[in-house]
A protein has these predicted regions:
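Catalytic core of soluble alpha/beta enzymes
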Residues: 19-173
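Catalytic domains of carbohydrate-active enzymes, especially glycoside hydrolases
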Residues: 4-22
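Acidic, Ser/Thr-rich peripheral helices and adjacent loops at domain boundaries
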Residues: 181-188
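Glycine-rich, aromatic-flanked loop segments that form ligand/cofactor-binding clefts
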Residues: 1
């Protein structure tokens, strides 16, 4: 079994990475540079998502971090490989202001803020273009949001998207349910 990040990349052939950020810009830049150095050295072509995990109080704070990521020479490949930013703003503030300043850098998705059936509708109006799918949020909500992604993308010419989360509620059957849902909505 691999015991380090480098060994995991070698053992599993990893090319997609979900990287957490803390909301403390200096610490995040330092950590991202260290993570990027490993990935850049080991993986010829890769994709990254940044997970803010509700650690930021505002879109401006996230935009500041993203600007620094873009400006940091050691993060050039890493920045170009970012697919989207996941739920950077605390759910209590996520729907207070538009996030268009963030979306200008990379698409932004809601995750923890997806508290009710119309959360994605609200988020769309503020500039979010993505939403996560988790079995714990409900099978039908994932189907509805998948339909919204298809319809809104066709109507607006914007690439709305969904991501499949790795959250399961219990071992065994729940894993198969999550995988079946991800496959059904095209997240494979």
């Amino acid at each position: 079994m691999p015991e380090s990040f480098e060994e995991a990349i070698d053992a599993y052939g990893l090319t997609f990475f979900k990287v957490k950020v803390s909301g403390v810009a200096d610490a995040d830049i330092d950590r991202l540079c260290r993570v990027a150095a490993v990935i850049d050295a080991k993986v010829p072509s890769y994709s990254v998502t940044l997970d803010g995990n509700e650690q930021f109080s505002s879109a401006e704070a996230v935009a500041d971090l993203l600007a620094r990521v873009k400006e940091e020479p050691r993060l050039a490949r890493f920045a170009a490989s970012i697919l989207f930013v996941e739920q950077p703003i605390a759910r209590a503030h996520a729907f207070e202001k538009p996030v268009k300043v963030l979306a200008a850098f990379k698409p932004v998705e809601i995750d923890e803020s997806d508290a009710d059936i119309d959360a994605f509708v609200t988020a769309r109006g503020l500039g979010y273009s993505g939403i996560s799918s988790k079995s714990c949020k409900g099978f039908y909500r994932s189907l509805l949001n998948r339909a919204r992604v298809a319809q809104w993308s066709a109507e607006d010419g914007i690439a709305y998207f969904m991501s499949a989360e790795d959250l399961t509620t219990q071992g065994g059957l729940a894993v198969q349910q999550d995988l079946a849902l991800a496959s059904l909505i095209g997240m494979t």
